[in-house]
Amino acid sequence: MKQHSQKLLSLLLCLAMVLSVFAGMGAPAAAADVTAEDVSQGKASSSFEPWGHGYRMVDILNFDPATDPYSQELVASVPLQERNATFAATQANKDLSDDSKLYVISSGNYRSTDVNEAPWNAGMSYDDFSYNLFKFWQYADMVGAGGRPTQNIAIGSADKEYGIIAVPMAAATNAAHKNGVITLAEYFIPRTPQYTEEWLYQAEDGSFPYAQKLVDLAKYYGFDGYFINQEASIDSSYVPLFREMLKYMREQGVYIQWYDSATESGGVSYQNAFNSNNSGWIWNETQGHVAHSIFLNYWYSSTALKNSKQHAIDLGLDPYEVVFMGVEGGQWEFGTDIETRYNAVDENGKPYTSFAIWGSDWYHEQFHKPNGRYEVGYQWEAEERERIYYTSATENAGEYSTGTVKRDDISYDDTINFQGFSKYVVEKSVINGASFASDFNNGHGMQYYRNGRVSRDMEWTNLNLQDILPTWQWWVQSADENRLELDWDYGPKFFRYVNGEEDHFNYTQIGAYNGGSSLAMHGALAGSQTVNLYKTKLDVTADSSISLTYNKPSADDTSKAQIALIFEEDPTQTVYLPIENSGKKTEGWTTATVSLGAYAGKTIAAIALELSATELVENYQLNLGRLVVSDGQSHTPAAPTGLKLVNRFDGTNEIQLAWDLGDYDTVKNYHVYAVYADGTERFVGGAYAANYYIQTLENAESVTALRVRAVGVDGSESAAAELPLASTCRVSNVRTLSENNMLNVTWTDPAESFAKVEATLTYWYSETTNENQTITVNQGDQKASFPIELEDGAQYIVTLTTVNADGTKNETVSYFSDLTDKYCAPYDGEGRVNPSGRINLTTPAVDDWNLAYVEVDGNTTTYRRFGGSSMANLSVKKDGLTLMVITLEDMDGNKSQPVTLMFLNGQPATAD
């Protein structure tokens, strides 16, 4: 349908230039003429830390995992888990229907992407506690990603270009899928200098090239769909095409949510309702179903919401599946109550529609700017605010109020009016089958504990390790005015600030049993209190049992703890299973196990802990460290296979591992451990993935091996696969210098005897015209040079392996960096005629460009990539020949060879 001949012309011009400059360059050779002085300014290895970039639409068209940075490291692998059917009898609000859904946007990030202090992170884990971890999956149905800068934009740079597409990080998708929640990438327009019309075209075979790549991107990275935020007007002639493209994606299993922006005419006009002006993007008589749902703009009224619901019904659509009323989290915070201010519920208190929160991470990202929100002492505040937002102002499910709670201790000075989403959205669960295990590990910690002992003495964040958390955070039912407080206990290294001053916690900080956190229940205990923990659908067999690992640091008292179970067969009755001697102070962690054989054939619908005392107990505390429901069978997986060292980087001590991924039905996670020279073992990290990047090893110089264990459905670990790490016969102090079309590499040989060093240069996820090369040099040379055809700033990995006299090879050392940039690729796009008869230039595919100089009839216009304008609506002569000469300039000031586009009588033409 569209002409693409210009791309070939641009490619030929580029190829001719490269050949003319670099003809006759020699093969790689030992660098006999390179001295230590030549590389005295050489640089050490860069960090290999994975980070996620935003995608321009031209990046989408060219998407290929082989050239997309960190494509192997950023894949989500956990399959979407099926949620249990709603069981009202065990809900905090038994009258609440399961109709209303919840979409939380921005919770697919560890941190905001809009600040210099935060890396544009998308990795599996980080050596830092102070990241935002979403903990309320039970209310969410969809989670989204915030914007991300495009590839090769320096962190902290004032020149930011955000991608049209932002993909949720893999760790968020893994955690979401574990909890039955789908994840959506964000599509946002306008993103100058990109524009919509560039990618809206259909191929002659009926396919949509861009749409197909969006489908491919979702399937490769493991997320489920897209939130289409089209806030730029398009010509009405494009509307049917746009809808066909969305339909094309939907028919391939991709979920689509449309924002209340562009209407039937293509113009942006926020309806703040679902009506005939925008419903065609969801369903119309000509095309049928298009997008799955719509996100309503925020300026609605009760009447608008009521009419939106009815409009969906009139179209034969489920209003709760289709219509999501927008909630502007960062603007409203706790000050706006959707029920009293917007009358968003009917006379029975039922919402008219579902909900979508824009800026759902506001409770973490909008406080203590610019740095305090990433300090340990303020993280307790963020977690309190999150709990208030999703549960209630009192942090107790089923207990709601507006305008009566004030919490200036969490940096919120106004009265809390928001009542919490648990009032409108029912809690959901994926806990089913016959086995379940939780360590109450919420995904980050000041340390990592294993069996109650510190196994990693460093801060960490890793959503992949987050357990399925308690269904209610919190829901405590008390027989009197006393009610225990609940907190995540991160151990004695955790601290907090209150109004800028360091403050203490009112419980003994114990830490975790496994992971980074345990659940502390503390305060005054008298009478009976029930701490509701999990909503489940667990089958009980004759061999079933339930075990609880707990720690009671408070003194001996008259208290009694009982596991409380509700069965589906008779939800009006609670079965209590006493824990012997539970009133006694424990010396560390202890485990109580109770047989469930007497209830074989029944189904556990809810698990709670009932605590009681015959007299008032002050300063009571009990920590929960592990809960296991077992069917009496072994669910320990086999040891992992295929464990290998991919890279071990010189200088940074970063390590990249890979192994064979087991089936999620039997393997729920992988744990990585470091083995030390004294025989001890420490936890490193983990994920359900086929690879793992290690940012930091404690006492790396003493590590002799790495072990990987698979984790089963019952929380048990497999035997370890072990990978020895060599401490000898490895080169060190690797440095490189990229100049004069040579990459000079130096290193220090090990003291041990060997014959040669094999040096290999590999271009990393690169489309560069440079070729991979291998050089072999003798022991003692300690240097090599690689000829570089094109100094284009490409990233590369150099691997250095010592080779023994018998040909056997020792452990490889890796080095990661980028070439000097002295080259700007030429413009490789094309000119297209838009509906107004003017010319739109497609975005340059090259990652590294800053300015575009467009010369027409002797007049040159400069277009800026950052904060500039799109290369659209350019004028050419309607009669005769127009030559358009385009020159690009990159961020280092290099200018490309000019490319000439021809237009004859206002239409693209070729030299033919």
What residues fall within each predicted segment?
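Conserved aromatic anchor
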Residues: 652-665, 741-752, 837-846
